[in-house]
Amino acid sequence: VPANGDVSAALAGDSPIDRFLAVEMSKHNIQPLPRASREALVRRLSFDLLGIPPTPEEVDDFVADGAPDAWERLVDRMLAAPQYGERWARHWLDIAHYADTHGFERDQRRDHAWRYRDWVIDALNADLPYDSFLQQQVAGDVLAEENPQANSTTDATIAASFLAVGPWDYVGQVETPSPVIKRLARADDLDDMVAQVMTSTCGITIHCARCHHHKLDPIQQEEYYALTAIFSGVKRGDRLVSTEESQRIDSKRNELKGRKLAIDQELNRTRVGISLADIVGGGNGFGTGTLGAGIDASTGAIRKPNDKKGFLDGVVANRLNTTTYPWIDSVFVPDGGTMARLAISQAGAVAQGIPSTDPKVWDAIRNGPVNSQFSTSLDGIECAPPGRSMLSLHANAGITFRLQKEPLEELQKSNAGSTDGGGIVFTAMVGYFGETASKGADVYVLIDDQLVFRYVGLGRNDGLQAIRHELPGGASTLTLIATDGGNGIGHDQICFIDASLAPSHRVESDEEALRVSELRKMSEELHAELASLPEARRVYGVVPEAPSEIRLLHRGNTEDARDVVLPGTVACVGPRMESIAALSSQSSDAQRRIALANWICSPENPLPARVLVNRLWHHHFGTGLVATPSDFGLGGALPSHPELLDWLANELHRGGWSVKRMHRMILLSDAYQRSSVRPESPTAVHSAVVLDAGNRLVWRQNPRRLDAESLRDTMLSVSGSIVHSMHGPGYRDFDYQEEYAPVYQHRVLETPDVFRRSIYRFVVRTTPHPFLTSLDCPNPATMTPVRNTTTTAIQSLATLNNAFVLQQSDRFAMRLQREVGDRAEAQAERAIRLAFGRKPTQTEIANAARLVQSAGLFQLCRILFNTNEFVYVD
């Protein structure tokens, strides 16, 4: 650190930072600007640390606080505020190019990605040491598994999602049948991970070496592929946050389902009737019936039946099969040649209300699953023990029971005097028994042409659902239908357990009636308890697997793979660690990523600490000591104060990698507190402007325009609309239409959820937010260490006419009326104080009041949102 004697007394300050800066200013005979006003300082600090403006009351408190440590206490208070994590998480998420969708042409949602965003917020608020912050994001999930006592398994698993938050080509990696495209998409995926880790942590532009040796930095192409091999066991996808948590919830759910199943079975046994499974099969619903015709998914044409055997013994498509059971005249299985809203049985049942002119749903109406994909066990509970019956329907299958007229009429006559109206009732428990990985199937029950039961998306986790419906007098058909839920999975399997028809009324003893009442109450209570069980938490993140072989790709061509490359790092940076040298082709994913995480955060690696303190400087001064925060190589900028950069990095190490300590050190310096406004006499700073127009010597503070999210949040704050609820899924200010390529259409809404801070926005990669994008909100398809600050006509149009701005202008006006009434002068004074964070002059109040009287309060609010003083921070 330079001694005070090395610089003039006018330049030297108490902070070592100021003494480093003073050395360079002394060389050029530049005098720094004085300290900014207290109003400007509190507003600057609030935006820098919290991303929102201070309230007028907070400004007044600081201005009136004459204690020597007033600024220090203000810094500490804001560093401790929860909004600090929300503000600074935005900077990190820019580097991570975080979003809530995949990107590319399918751009599907990542409904659980938000947990990573919340982890970043919480880690920053907790001042997680920066070395741990990096290590957990590279290898947190596997570090926690190896040492659960030293790591929070939950947090560390979420932290590792850093590797997966970038864009992902679903078509290239999943849907395409082309192995060439798959290899290219996977290579791009690994390149994204390598580039993200190395640029964010070490400021190295490693991806330049994908096709050849790095043109500027001493990085060989082999080293690029050695780093790629580190991540060759990393795939992206949803995963459980905690296996133990999932097991606890599943165990409790299975216990409740088992108890409810036993109760529902006892309830069903209180009724006397006939089993529908006995009618169509050998007592269990299985048989060797001929598979019916299906509908071609692409053309809608009828396909010819094939010879594949199915279930429903003795039942042939498009043929009525007579029975000898009371109440059932015949059974009918359709051939699939008819679709929704068309009759599906000769008995007259009509499939109304089924989502089905879409051939994806009715791509093949058939019966009979593939035996290997079917089990009668659900969540470990056997649903077809001796004495039970099962009636199974393959996905996109239907069966109709035509009811006999005479027995039904006799039954109704015999029960004509009963309180419940008599007749017969259909009861069953229905469950999904197909593949666990499937999203489930849809179930429909129709009586005549009326839909009486529907369950959309019935899956294994839903257990058995009870059905009970009384058949009205004169009912002629009972139809059961299962469809694939629109997912095109034809091996989904639905089973009706103990499906039966029974008299709806019979004489019960008082003891029986009491028992039935008790059973129903117990069943309802268990159903409510099941519904209240939380789902096991999931996060979109790293799905580890056995690492694949990595070969050097000649000129980056995935079809010209050369020698096998072992996992490793770059030789020009960091230590030669034994854990890296010991990696081999047999090393596990955990060994590879842990070795890299330790290499990055080794005290011998000079880059991570320097990269971090430079990013902090960049966000506090507008430009880093190195103007290229993610490129510390020969292609990047030279540091303006290399000794200061080294000293700050050493202080980070010395302070236990505490980020908040580094903030505090910078914010307490004279350099940070300098004015950004030139004095009225230009001669005082003429030499500084001539010699250092870009302010690389930090003789003044840089005025900065609010970034897009901060501008939106500030409008919400000033209008009184902002909702400060933290965490959870992002707000969705768009309409969503599920298609092959989903459609997102942004809207301006009035719900409280969308008035949360912008950090909680659900970010769509392929459909940028129109208002925020016009204000230089970055594209999350790429990493953004430095945001653009452009000045365009569309920005003026957006801040003047965008529906969100008009909405908030109106809410701002309503706030002013609530707080100060209808007097124009009071409204003007309060509006300027809220918007600018300072007391207005009498001239400003008079001019603003005249505008309110002539054009209305709304127009004043709208204009204030468009002033430079509102948009810029001095």
Language-model regions, residue ranges each:
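Gly-Asp-aromatic-enriched flexible segments
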Residues: Q265-E525
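A structural supersecondary motif
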Residues: R765, T773-M783
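Primarily short, surface-exposed interaction patches in extracytoplasmic proteins
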Residues: A9-R43, D48, I52-Q83, Y98-Q149, ...
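Sequence context surrounding c-type heme c attachment/ligation sites in exported
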Residues: S152-N254, L772, T784
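N-terminal pre-domain segments of enzymes
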Residues: V1-A10
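Surface positions of alpha-helical coiled-coils, especially the charged/polar e/g heptad sites
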Residues: D238-V241, E245-R248, K252, R259, ...
